[in-house]
Structures are given as C-alpha cells and as structure tokens.
C-alpha cells in the first residue's frame, strides 16, 4: 500500500517537472523567434 503512494507521488513529480521543462522551452523558442 505504501509503495503505491510513493509511486503516484513520484509520477506526479516527474510529470510536473517535464511539463515545466516543455513550457519553458516553448516560451524560449517563441521569445527568440518573435523578440516580442
């Protein structure tokens, strides 16, 4: 039971990290492309 909690928490943490990285990359590419 305890293992499932840690697994879900880790999964959410990794997904959040990946989402932030993708969002940051998209914003950076847009900023460099338009310079707005």
Curated annotation (Swiss-Prot):
GO biological process, one term: photosynthesis
Subcellular localization: Cell inner membrane
Molecular functions per Gene Ontology: electron transfer activity
Membrane-related topology note: Single-pass membrane protein
InterPro entries, alphabetized: PetM_cyt_b6/f_cplx_su7
Ranges annotated as spanning the membrane: 5-25
Any GO CC annotation of this UniProt entry: plasma membrane
Keyword Transport: yes
Main location class: membrane
Keyword list, A-Z: Cell inner membrane, Cell membrane, Electron transport, Membrane, Photosynthesis, Transmembrane, Transmembrane helix, Transport
Pfam families the record matches: PetM
Function: Component of the cytochrome b6-f complex, which mediates electron transfer between photosystem II (PSII) and photosystem I (PSI), cyclic electron flow around PSI, and state transitions.
Record text on subunit structure and interactions: The 4 large subunits of the cytochrome b6-f complex are cytochrome b6, subunit IV (17 kDa polypeptide, PetD), cytochrome f and the Rieske protein, while the 4 small subunits are PetG, PetL, PetM and PetN. The complex functions as a dimer.
Family: Belongs to the PetM family.
Protein name per its UniProtKB record: Cytochrome b6-f complex subunit 7
Organism annotation: Gloeobacter violaceus (strain ATCC 29082 / PCC 7421)
Gene: petM
């Amino acid at each position: 039971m305890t293992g499932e909690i840690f697994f879900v928490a880790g999964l959410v943490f990794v997904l959040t990290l990946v989402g932030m990285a993708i969002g940051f990359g998209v914003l950076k590419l847009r900023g460099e492309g338009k310079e707005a």
